[in-house]
Amino acid sequence: PSYVLFVGDVAQIPSFSGNTGSHVSDLYYCTYDGASDIYPDIYYGRFSANNTAQLIPQIEKTLMFEEYTFPDPSYLDEVVLVAGVDASMAPTYGNGQINYGTDNYFNNAHGFASPHVYLYGSGSPITSDQSIASSSILNDVSEGVGFANYTAHCFEQGWADPAFENSDISGLSNTDKYCVIVSNCCLPNAFDNQACFGEAVVRANGKGAVGHIGASNNTYWNEDYWWAVGSGSISANPTYSQTGLGIFDCLFHDNGEPVSDWFTTLSQIVHSGNLAVTAAGGDEEYYWEIYHVMGDPS
């Protein structure tokens, strides 16, 4: 098999305790080359649910994507990209990640006519440090986006600043316009928590996300930047030629990358990001342990 989907929360399918910190990790269900192996042989994800009411929305959203039964699929060309608030790190790390995405991929040449971009400090119509940023992002998601990426600070219940938290999910109105969310930040997929952000946003019935990618423990600015952009020097304006392959490159793979570097499913996105951390000499074992897919890995 190429994929495994765990169905249930930790009470139904226990997770492993990480070797590199106090976090849960499903990694070791999928490594088969001895105790020191940290590279999964099977792509994996989790439908975290304690009951059928939490499970059924995840199945229904996934089937809509699998069968392509969207009433209006045009929303898939909408994206939200957020460099969250951190006065010290966001101008280079956060803005660099988002700038790399828009310069190379999330642009008109790739069918994204008007990406909803929130840079820190300056450079976008609404910056992430403005008071209206949170409500604007929630409105974007409610109107329908296919993909959302946030990089900055989080906690177990969601994005910190601009805020997008568990308590905001009930107010969303994106029925039949579900998104994939990638949260490069601390703890949004801490699925041993009562209900982390990643669990809540995919469990939501008739709204929220079809899948959420995030970490079950704290993340780090260097590694999260490399995870998205690729190995190389940290810059506010990185270029393809100056970096290795990160998740954006492997997802779009339109620069002549070999087929072996095409990573397009949710669990493959995680895999490509972790490979970038490995290539950069970052804290690889920790990252292979903490990044998870809440949703269908395939």
Which residue stretches match the model-derived regions?
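Cysteine-dependent hydrolase recognition
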Residues: P1-S298
